[in-house]
């Protein structure tokens, strides 16, 4: 039976944590959202793209996955963020549109943000996330997977929930070369740690409230009325006021993280299959609890966590 302390791969829910790292650097005066990213990654061959555009998926850049699939010679060797940047330099794929001329959700934006965090902070992305974010709010079970650079390992990480592909029979999800790209995915965490992050947002423990609020502002003013807008690492619901969320899917895992501020509700769902609840069913859970979950609902020690956060000298804030 799974519990709140079991660790899963978050897939694209990782993006909200990458965005938080960027906001932390901005709050310290180290990063300007509207500066060209070539001022941070000077070798990057596309000008006119800002950190803000990466955060809101408005860069227009084409998918790195397509580049790697076409040109990476040995799929047993990890493809890293540095390799990704090198491939954009080498092959210069045509962007989908000019910077800030549209919205296109793409993993490349958040993979580049991880590289931005590294260049600005002087730390590796996994180290920055651990030392500056996870440790700061006692997310003790959370980490960024750092794949060995030489060859693929056969499985994921010990003590983490194994992912599965649901075909005729469940098949273990194997490690693969794109798992070395960080920022867009490949963060591991559990329900309790993720709830700590949600409370840390409420109490302004990572960035001031004025900066945190920018994460929940629509990044595309002329966005389709039929789709939910996107802020900094969060989707913004068009159906529910003051409701923000993100889905995740990647190689044997699905995830969903939602905060409903008006009703003071948080919904965190982590699964270890690539096929499980649909996006519609996620929303049904929030709206009317129409979906039955097995084995049972889990009670999170909300009061205990909130009380620990309220008092900064408690053990919760220990590094």
Where are these regions (language model features)?
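Short, conserved catalytic-motif segment at the N-terminal edge
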Residues: 1-8, 30-34, 241
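Short, gly/Ser/Thr-rich active-site loops of penicillin-recognizing serine hydrolases
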Residues: 228, 240, 275-319
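Short, well-ordered beta-strand elements
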Residues: 256-274
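Short, small/polar residue-rich loop motifs at catalytic or cofactor-binding pockets
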Residues: 252-253
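A short, well-structured edge-of-sheet supersecondary motif
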Residues: 1, 233-235, 267-268
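Short, glycine/proline-biased beta-turn/loop segments that scaffold the active-site neighborhood
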Residues: 32-47, 136-137
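Active/ligand-binding-proximal structured segments within catalytic/core domains
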Residues: 18
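Short, surface-exposed loop or secondary-structure junction motifs
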Residues: 48-249
């Amino acid at each position: 039976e799974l519990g709140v302390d079991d660790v899963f791969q978050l897939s694209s829910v990782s993006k909200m944590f990458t965005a938080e790292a960027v906001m932390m650097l901005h709050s310290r005066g180290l990063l300007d959202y509207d500066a060209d990213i070539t001022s941070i990654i000077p070798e990057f061959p596309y000008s006119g793209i800002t950190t803000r555009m990466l955060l809101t998926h408005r860069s227009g850049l084409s998918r790195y996955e397509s580049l790697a699939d076409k040109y990476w010679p040995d799929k047993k060797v990890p493809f890293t963020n540095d390799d990704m940047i090198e491939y954009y330099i080498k092959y210069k794929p045509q962007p989908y549109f000019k910077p800030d001329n549209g919205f296109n959700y793409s993993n490349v934006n958040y993979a580049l943000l991880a590289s931005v965090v590294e260049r600005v902070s002087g730390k590796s992305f996994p180290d920055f996330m651990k030392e500056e974010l996870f440790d700061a709010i006692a997310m003790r079970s959370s980490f960024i997977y750092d794949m060995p650079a030489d060859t693929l390992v056969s499985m994921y990480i010990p003590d983490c929930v194994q992912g599965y592909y649901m075909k005729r029979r469940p098949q273990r999800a194997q490690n693969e070369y794109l798992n070395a790209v960080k920022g867009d995915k490949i963060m591991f965490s559990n329900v309790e740690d993720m709830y700590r992050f949600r409370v840390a947002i409420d109490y302004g423990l990572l960035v001031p409230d004025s900066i945190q609020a920018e994460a929940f502002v629509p990044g595309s003013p002329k966005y389709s009325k039929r789709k939910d807008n996107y802020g900094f690492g969060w989707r913004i619901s068009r159906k529910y006021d003051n409701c923000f969320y993100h889905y995740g899917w990647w190689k044997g895992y699905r995830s969903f993280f939602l905060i409903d501020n008006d009703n003071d509700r948080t919904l965190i769902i982590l699964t270890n299959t690539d096929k499980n609840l649909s996006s519609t069913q996620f929303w049904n859970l929030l709206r009317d609890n129409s979906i039955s979950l097995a084995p049972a609902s889990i009670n999170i020690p909300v009061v205990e966590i909130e009380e620990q956060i309220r008092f900064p000298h408690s053990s919760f804030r220990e590094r």
